[in-house]
């Protein structure tokens, strides 16, 4: 079976950029946003709820179901690419640590999580909303005034998938004290010091290092952004990004994000 790694990064924090940098390595197939985790969760839900499984020998069904999960993942990834390593990108992997460990006989999965100053992540979402007026944001309802202001959108994003859910996954990782099993990357450090960050990542993945070209990043992850609210286009050159949150959100909204997620800012050493 191929080696599979999992990119479970925070939304609007550079996960697509990271995929395309790593895709420069000829041994790595980096996916666009993937539904593989969703397939596993759907199978898990069916297995847990259906009487056809519950009524049979528990030990036998457990063995068979584990084989189904592993075999399904193997078949899926083998048909994606002939390359040695698969880097599958989904926000949902952040909540799948224990499932993946269960599937592979106690072996800890290699999960990468890119994080960013939350004010900048939220500002990126708000910017996408404002500057894509041709798209109808699916949750906005003019009749009920749902999500018709920045304040309402902030509160919605904070408790919804994928942004709020990924933050919950991150918080649970620290609560469960498994943060040392996850490779966290600060987006700001990745942009400013990409080579040492990548060397640390390769060391975590336990694969041979590849010298990347951070000045000429080709976008090879191909997906139809018409199915998503936000686009996934990347910059060709990796360099620090100027902060925009204060200009886009204003001080009140920035303070709201900090106050409600102070634990995050402290865990990852982001200043007020």
Predicted regions and their residues:
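PAPS-dependent sulfotransferase catalytic domain
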Residues: 88-212, 226-229, 233
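Alpha-helix-centered segments that form part of catalytic cores
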Residues: 64-86, 155-170
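Short, solvent-exposed loop/helix junctions and linker helices
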Residues: 12, 191-192, 251
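Generic structural marker for isolated residues within well-ordered, non-membrane alpha-helices
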Residues: 19, 97, 198, 254, ...
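PAPS-dependent sulfotransferase catalytic core
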Residues: 1-74, 80, 224
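Short, well-ordered beta-strand elements within core beta-sheets of diverse protein domains
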Residues: 6-8, 185-190, 246
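PAPS-dependent sulfotransferases, especially Golgi type II membrane carbohydrate sulfotransferases
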Residues: 1-5, 174-175, 203-272
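Short active-site oxyanion
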Residues: 4-5, 84-85, 110
